[in-house]
Every structure is written in structure tokens, then in C-alpha cells.
Amino acid sequence: MIQSQINRNIRLDLADAILLSKAKKDLSFAEIADGTGLAEAFVTAALLGQQALPADAARLVGAKLDLDEDAILLLQMIPLRGCIDDRIPTDPTMYRFYEMLQVYGTTLKALVHEKFGDGIISAINFKLDVKKVADPEGGERAVITLDGKYLPTKPF
């Protein structure tokens, strides 16, 4: 039976335990996700308390991380999403995303509306990918793909 969480702290505590186990076992998120049939980003989001895993994926991930049955069950529960405190992020990486939306948020909104009309980009019917690519000018670049279904506003 599908279960839902109403307290975000239990999943945040589990995320801390998962990250500790991940570090002790020297595993990458890609290695943990391998064999689940799910995207690395989706499994990572679940491990960090933002998504629910199907039972078979939760068991596989749990085995890789030596999680107990309660933790495996928690990974299958629908979480209380959006666990970032209601303030401007202070973590430098998260802040840069906040900054990108401060600078380009209105541009993204205008371009989405111009190309699609009045509506939103779904974060439910959504895919996320992060790639590391060489920068022709030296160093490396992050290519982040946000792939969400467009949902039009419907008059009623």
C-alpha cells in the first residue's frame, strides 16, 4: 500500500545516514543507481529525501548501502518534498542556482510563455541530467538539462 510522510525530518535523517554509508563504501550516486532502471538524478533525489523509490529499487539501493528494513521502507514512502529552508540558500552551489533564477527567471518565463503560451513546466513529469564536458577555452563546464512537460493553463 502506498504510504505518505508528513514530517520531513525523518527523511533528512535518513539522507544523512545514506550519505555516511555512501562515503564509507566510497560509492558514487551513479554506482548506487546502477541496476535500478532509474536515472541517476532520480535515485539521488530519492536518497536525499525528495522522491520515493519503487520497492525493487529501494531494496537494491538498500542492499548496496547496508540499510535496514525500516530505511528501505522509508525510501518507498512519498516524502514531504521541498526540504530547503524558506530562506535564501547559503550553500555556494545551491546559491548559484538561486542566483541563476534571479538573473534568468524572468527570461525563462518570457521564453516559455512565448513559445508555449500561458502555462508551466512540470516538475512532476520531469527529467534532470548533469554532465561534465570539456571547455574549449580550458577547464570544464557543467551541462544541466531540465526536461519538464509543458502544462497549459486551462480556463474554467
UniProtKB/Swiss-Prot annotation:
GO terms for molecular function: cyanate hydratase activity; DNA binding. InterPro entries: Cyanase, Cyanate_lyase_C, Cyanate_lyase_C_sf, CYNS_N, Lambda_DNA-bd_dom_sf. The active site is at residues 96, 99, 122. Disulfide bonds: none annotated. Keywords: Lyase. Transmembrane segments: none annotated. Pfam families: Cyanate_lyase, CYNS_N. SMART domains: Cyanate_lyase (SM01116). GO terms for biological process: cyanate metabolic process. The keyword Lyase applies. Its EC number is 4.2.1.104. It is an enzyme of class 4 (lyase). It catalyses: cyanate + hydrogencarbonate + 3 H(+) = NH4(+) + 2 CO2. Catalyzes the reaction of cyanate with bicarbonate to produce ammonia and carbon dioxide. Belongs to the cyanase family. This is Cyanate hydratase. It comes from Escherichia coli O139:H28 (strain E24377A / ETEC).
